[in-house]
């Protein structure tokens, strides 16, 4: 899901470009793990205090994406866009909404976007629940 995304500094998508800059606090703290790109995604929490999981950790902090680090990509946390894709939102749904073209002020900031995504029911899960209710509706409500 995340492989085709540009790195934040190369993206013009505000939901990919802006992300939490919270520093690594040590493996004993919440949100200090690097996600596994080819495995089940992490729970996206609404209340993370900036400690959203890492997309990539440095070698010093136990990072496993050595090829990316050797290319000069740096340690960083997941972006709102990456969190939204993990939660099954459509790739064009906007979460970070700039107030102006200079991207200095925001209607919805990256921090606000993380909260929206973390509080949401994943769209594909909601769809399957709705379909199940629709299929059973006539059984329980005649």
Give names to the regions the model predicted.
Residues 1-4:
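A conserved active-site cap/scaffold subdomain adjacent to cofactor or substrate pockets
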Residues 7-142:
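C-terminal target-recognition/interaction regions appended to catalytic cores
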């Amino acid at each position: 899901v995340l492989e085709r995304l540009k790195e934040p500094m190369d993206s013009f998508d505000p939901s990919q470009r802006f992300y939490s800059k919270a520093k690594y606090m040590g493996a004993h703290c919440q949100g200090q793990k690097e996600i596994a790109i080819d495995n089940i995604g992490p729970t996206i929490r609404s209340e993370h205090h900036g400690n959203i999981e890492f997309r990539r950790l440095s070698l010093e902090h136990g990072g496993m994406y050595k090829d990316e680090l050797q290319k000069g990509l740096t340690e960083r946390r997941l972006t709102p866009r990456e969190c939204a894709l993990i939660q099954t939102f459509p790739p064009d749904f906007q979460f970070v909404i700039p107030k102006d073209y200079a991207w200095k002020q925001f209607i919805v900031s990256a921090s606000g976007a993380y909260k929206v995504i973390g509080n949401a029911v994943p769209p594909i899960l909601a769809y399957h629940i709705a379909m199940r209710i629709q299929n059973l509706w006539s059984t329980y409500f005649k």
